[in-house]
């Protein structure tokens, strides 16, 4: 995801080269002499991890990939959306991972016309909220002692409705316009 939006992992953290078993890389500019990807890919290849490169051309990193998927330039985002669509459709989403490491259970305000419609619901201290299934109430999303919901419509203390962000993602990307045939 970082490269798709123009970032680079050496600025924001890097893949777990020591434990990765399957590494999928999307269209990376290969113009950095000291690029740490080279070292990381060497570690992956030595350990026998699978390396898949998604890039319009099979040069550089793609040439050493275990599998190369050649796509049209500028369509990597569409491919990611089609993959999300298929994973959702096949019910192959690791919800435990999403709950622990992402904002999937964070509640999103559903109040058409309000200034904060579509924003994360927050408590008085500004902490994002989730719905705790065990207590049947809102709770700080980052609390470790809750059982967060990832689907459903819930009522916030102020009476407004909110849904987990994962539900919004699923509703959008399960639409057939994101199927592999459509994109």
Predicted regions and their residues:
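A short helix->loop->beta-strand "cap" motif at the edges of active sites that frequently abuts
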Residues: 43-50
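Glycine/threonine-rich flexible loop motifs
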Residues: 30-39
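Long, well-ordered, tryptophan-enriched scaffold segments
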Residues: 62-63, 67-183
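Short acidic, glycine-rich surface-loop motifs adjacent to enzyme active sites
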Residues: 19-31
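Anionic-ligand anchoring segments at beta-strand to alpha-helix junctions in alpha/beta enzyme folds, i.e.
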Residues: 1-19
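Short, polar loop motifs at secondary-structure junctions
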Residues: 54-60
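Generic recognition of flexible, low-complexity loop/linker segments
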Residues: 10-14, 40, 183
């Amino acid at each position: 995801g970082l490269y798709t939006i123009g970032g680079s992992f050496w600025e924001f953290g890097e893949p777990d080269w020591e434990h990765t078993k399957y590494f999928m890389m999307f269209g990376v500019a290969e113009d950095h002499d000291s690029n740490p990807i080279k070292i990381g890919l060497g570690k992956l290849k030595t350990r026998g991890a699978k390396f898949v490169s998604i890039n319009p051309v099979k040069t550089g990193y793609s040439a050493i990939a275990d599998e190369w998927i050649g796509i049209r330039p500028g369509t990597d985002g569409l491919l990611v959306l089609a993959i999300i669509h298929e994973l959702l459709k096949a019910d192959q989403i690791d919800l435990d991972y999403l709950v622990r490491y992402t904002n999937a259970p964070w509640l999103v305000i559903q109040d058409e016309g309000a200034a904060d419609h579509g924003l994360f619901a927050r408590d008085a201290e500004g902490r994002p909220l989730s719905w705790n299934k065990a207590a049947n109430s809102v709770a700080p999303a980052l609390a470790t002692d809750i059982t967060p919901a990832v689907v459903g419509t819930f009522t916030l203390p102020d009476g407004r409705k909110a849904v987990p962000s994962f539900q919004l993602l699923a509703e959008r990307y399960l639409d057939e316009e994101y199927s592999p045939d459509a994109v």
